[in-house]
């Protein structure tokens, strides 16, 4: 599939094993390339829906000087947004606990921004999914944190893990977006390269 991509070397610029797994599911050959210490800050003035795309574009710009003419780069960033604002990745157990406690018994938004870039083209998009969590008890939150240590995940949880099985009541939107890469939309966009 996607014969148009055969002219490119596809590069996924991500440390995320979930993004690697999801992109593999599209049956696209790619390599992973990671630059450490990319600035993931954003201006306070931008809307929450724009934050992930802003960061995904910043990541792409960091890679641009090293890109070969035949490379197609994919970058992404995911945030969790609640009534209290943006949740990124928790720095420690205490932050992860506070995040899960805040998500418990509420609906939150998961927004992923994706940037696809070649030397001549740069396309970006965002996908939003609403996730409804059941009420989580302290015992359930502590069990999850002790066993899964979700410190590399926006909002402090992985929907594909135990907490998703027992805590997610409903999703409106893409499940794969909540995992970190909206592969259906990505596939549609890749058709145009």
Swiss-Prot record:
Domain of life of the organism encoding this protein: Bacteria
Feature type site, description Important for substrate specificity: 18, 78, 160
Active site: 77 (proton acceptor)
Biological processes annotated in GO: nucleotide metabolic process
Class of this enzyme: hydrolase
Cofactor(s), by name: a divalent metal cation
Keyword annotations from UniProtKB, A to Z: Cytoplasm, Hydrolase, Nucleotide metabolism
Annotated protein name in UniProt: dTTP/UTP pyrophosphatase
Upper taxonomic lineage: Bacteria, Pseudomonadati, Bacteroidota, Bacteroidia, Bacteroidales
